[in-house]
């Protein structure tokens, strides 16, 4: 399908950057666990602004133009980036550890790395496969991050991501 062709173009053009973005996410997440300083918390919020902005601009605006609704998806992810920017300046989400959902958080953190394996199991190879810096991966990582540090979280981010996930889930049945 055209969706997978666009996905392949995105992966071919950005794979090196995706590796750097993923490595930065791993380092910043690790920093939140081991040394949750104010710098680490603000750095994670800056990263989330960048990551969601990347999905909005690079993924949807630059590589998903064939989708008639790509502007809507770009706006949606842009709003999430703005919500993280607002959070950066207000300090609303303090990133305080909550070990209550450890198992679920572990599963959610693993999912961005499982997506390529699941794509491969479906017979897709690079560059057609889902990677760690795509909307599904970013959504599950963000939900995992907010659950892991959920003493107080930005509910708007969660509502937006859950709404997107419910709608996007249907594409599993549409695109084969």
Feature-to-residue mapping (PLM):
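Short, small-residue-biased leader/transition segments that mark boundaries at the very start
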Residues: 3-4
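Hydrophobic alpha-helical transmembrane segments
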Residues: 9-24, 94-95, 148-155
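N-terminal signal-anchor/start-transfer transmembrane helix
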Residues: 20-35
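Hydrophobic/aromatic-rich structural module bridging two neighboring secondary-structure elements via a short loop
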Residues: 38-86
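Membrane-interfacial loop-to-transmembrane alpha-helix junctions, especially the N-terminal start
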Residues: 39-49, 98-105, 150-161
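Aromatic-anchored segments of alpha-helical transmembrane domains
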Residues: 50-58, 108-119, 161-173
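Membrane-helix boundary connector in multi-pass membrane proteins
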Residues: 62-66, 147-159, 165-176
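Membrane-proximal helix-loop-helix units in multi-pass membrane proteins
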Residues: 67-142
